[in-house]
């Protein structure tokens, strides 16, 4: 055993070095290379293809680049809103000063008794949700060791409670109280991205996911799939 100890120590040291080098790669966004890099929307030509926006010249930076008043105003969760919920995002698309800082926030308003933020995921960020008012049932789906098996991690979160949704996992929130609910979420990405499961499969994908693929996946008739698709507004 004594002869093997140096090898074990060497392997452990090597693993520690690899983990320390990999740690920055596990962050939601890349590390920043300067104190500030306020997004310069006007200089962007075509769609964004990098992890961040071009930087505005520092001489042109103002306090307004780091300010957003939108999270203090309730959103309409009733008018033509089948989900009974509304998200107000405070990402780099609305706060240019967030560029390269790797954080963002959102406010979610829910109608009482059933207002839901339907199953969705954030491919680029972990979310921590704070219930500012009301009562929310929340949950996320995690894969288990059994083949093709998943488990729902769920609970009711009261006012003042906090719940964490791990990065990339499908999750939802639903109001279960008799008054409107409000939640504030924080993300470890300037632009976490949101992919709503139902809309991605049945609605906004272009081209659309083939009906026969969905029929086989959900083990239903193609007519059922077409009926569901008809309820979504295709982009």
Curated annotation (Swiss-Prot):
Residues carrying a glycan: 60
Leader peptide range in chain numbering: 1-27
Cellular component per GO, a single term: plasmodesma
Keywords assigned: Apoplast, Disulfide bond, Glycoprotein, Manganese, Metal-binding, Secreted, Signal
Superkingdom per UniProt: Eukaryota
Family matches, as CDD domains: cupin_OxOx
One GO molecular-function entry: manganese ion binding
UniProt keyword annotation of Signal present: yes
Domain Cupin type-1 intervals: 69-226
Biological-process GO terms, alphabetical: plasmodesmata-mediated intercellular transport; regulation of root development
Disulphide bond pairs: 37-55
Pfam family for this entry, one: Cupin_1
Gene3D superfamilies assigned: Jelly Rolls
Subcellular localization: Secreted, Extracellular space, Apoplast
Annotated residues for binding of Mn(2+): 120, 122, 127, 171
Predominant subcellular localization, coarse grouping: secreted
Keyword Signal among record annotations: yes
Family statement drawn from the similarity comment of this UniProt entry: Belongs to the germin family.
Quaternary assembly: Oligomer (believed to be a pentamer but probably hexamer).
PANTHER family: GERMIN-LIKE PROTEIN SUBFAMILY 3 MEMBER 3
Cited function: May play a role in plant defense. Probably has no oxalate oxidase activity even if the active site is conserved.
Name by which UniProt lists this protein: Germin-like protein 1-4
Organism: Oryza sativa subsp. japonica (Rice)
């Amino acid at each position: 055993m004594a002869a093997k100890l140096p090898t074990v120590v060497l392997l452990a040291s090597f693993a520690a070095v690899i983990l320390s080098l990999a740690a920055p790669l596990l962050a939601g966004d890349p590390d920043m290379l300067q104190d500030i890099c306020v997004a310069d929307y006007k200089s962007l030509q075509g769609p964004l293809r990098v992890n961040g926006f071009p930087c505005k010249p520092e001489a042109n930076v103002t306090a307004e680049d780091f300010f957003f008043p939108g999270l203090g105003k309730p959103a309409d969760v009733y008018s033509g809103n089948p989900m009974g919920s509304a998200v107000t995002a405070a990402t780099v698309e609305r706060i240019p000063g967030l560029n390269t800082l790797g954080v963002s926030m959102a406010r979610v308003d829910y109608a009482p008794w059933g207002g839901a933020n339907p199953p969705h995921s954030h491919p680029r960020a972990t979310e921590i949700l704070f219930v500012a008012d009301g009562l929310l049932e929340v949950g996320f789906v995690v894969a288990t060791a059994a083949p093709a098996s998943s488990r729902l991690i769920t609970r009711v979160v009261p006012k003042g409670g906090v719940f964490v949704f791990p990065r990339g996992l499908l999750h939802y929130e639903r109001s279960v109280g008799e008054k409107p609910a409000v939640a504030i979420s924080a993300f470890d990405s300037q632009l976490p991205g949101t992919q709503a499961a139902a809309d991605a499969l049945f609605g906004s994908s272009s081209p659309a996911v083939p009906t026969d693929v969905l029929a086989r996946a959900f083990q239903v008739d193609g007519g059922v799939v077409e009926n569901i698709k008809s309820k979504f507004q295709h982009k």
